[in-house]
């Protein structure tokens, strides 16, 4: 079972590196993706700055090394909806079911916080992720008008 906790400033550098490494490998280190998000270098400040609306879970290995994470934040494009953001794992953590556990943690936190729906956006290069989202009950929707990451081309929603 995966060990995870809320992000701290000590995690910022490690999780930013994991996000950037994944996006570089997928040729998504381009404008319109999380690669260029201004808060990427300081995710703890962004998520902990509004703790009643946002949360970022850091996944840890058996020696407490950061191996990934997932964020949840308010999404203003759909009523009572949170957005699941920046679900990424280090290569050493892939293929072990950790993404599924992180999604479950995100869903649980969002539901407990009062959100009724969970939205996410992704890119067609992330085929493994899209299969996971669909398997976990996310339904593909049309692109919402308020999308900030213009490069994303697949959009999903799930009722909690």
Where are these regions (language model features)?
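Acetyl-CoA-dependent GNAT
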Residues: 2, 6-85, 90-91, 103-105, ...
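C-terminal "cap" of GNAT-fold acetyltransferases
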Residues: 25, 116-160
């Amino acid at each position: 079972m995966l060990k995870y906790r809320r992000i701290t400033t000590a995690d910022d550098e490690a999780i930013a590196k994991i996000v950037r490494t994944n996006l570089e490998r997928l040729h998504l280190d381009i404008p319109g993706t999380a690669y260029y998000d201004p808060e990427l270098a300081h995710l703890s400040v962004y998520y902990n700055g509004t703790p009643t609306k946002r949360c970022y879970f850091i996944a840890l290995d058996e020696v407490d090394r950061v191996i990934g994470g997932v964020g949840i934040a308010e999404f203003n494009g759909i009523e009572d909806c949170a957005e699941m953001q920046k679900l990424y794992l280090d290569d050493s953590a892939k293929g072990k079911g950790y993404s599924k556990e992180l999604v479950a943690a995100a869903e649980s936190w969002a539901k407990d916080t009062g959100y009724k729906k969970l939205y996410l956006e992704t890119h067609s290069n992330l085929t493994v992720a899209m299969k996971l989202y669909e398997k976990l009950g996310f339904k593909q929707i049309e692109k919402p008008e308020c999308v900030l990451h213009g490069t994303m081309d697949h959009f999903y929603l799930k009722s909690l």
